[in-house]
């Protein structure tokens, strides 16, 4: 064993399984997580005067033809410069316990156990482009089950996530959380 292994703590890839694929035994709990995230975003938009009380909206769409479930809101979105920090990192939430509905920064990943790809699409109010963070659940399962390699948790996160940007077609922030099952 080299000194860097002894001196520096390591977190193996199996912890990712506990926080994603193994978080919920019953899939319906993931919907609560995404709706709570949307509700927190709507509350923030009202607090920032981006929306007036009564203008907020959370929509749930089940698209059986394309095998997708979409949960969207008309709230603040995430600033493009913060998307990687907010949507790829785990347990780095800025939400406040007792004030926000969610606060740990892990619930959004529970959907990975029930889909092939988990997509977070967001645009911050007034920004001209939207960010699309995709988590590859199939690749995540493959990496975790591969006992011949012992990747660190952060290496796995880098491998299974992808960030794209596209021109936004509206000035109102949108946040969609999609499951391709």
Predicted ranges, named:
Residues 1-179:
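GHKL (Bergerat-fold) ATPase N-terminal catalytic module, capturing the glycine-rich phosphate-binding loop
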């Amino acid at each position: 064993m080299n000194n860097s292994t002894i001196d520096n703590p390591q977190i193996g890839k199996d912890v990712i399984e506990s926080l994603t694929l193994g978080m919920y035994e019953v899939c319906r709990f993931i919907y609560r997580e995404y709706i709570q995230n949307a509700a927190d975003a709507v509350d923030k938009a009202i607090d920032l005067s981006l929306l007036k009380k009564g203008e907020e909206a959370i929509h749930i769409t089940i698209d059986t033809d394309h095998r997708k479930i979409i949960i969207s809101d008309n709230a603040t979105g995430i600033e493009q410069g913060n998307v990687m920090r907010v949507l790829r990192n785990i347990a780095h939430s800025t939400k406040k316990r007792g004030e926000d509905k969610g606060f740990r920064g892990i619930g959004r990943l529970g959907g990975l156990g029930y889909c092939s790809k988990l997509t977070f699409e967001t645009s911050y109010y007034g920004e001209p482009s939207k960010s699309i963070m995709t988590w590859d659940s199939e690749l995540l399962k493959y990496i975790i089950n591969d006992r011949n390699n012992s990747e660190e948790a952060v290496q796995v996160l880098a491998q299974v996530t992808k960030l794209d940007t596209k021109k936004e077609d509206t000035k109102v922030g949108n946040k969609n959380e999609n499951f391709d099952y």
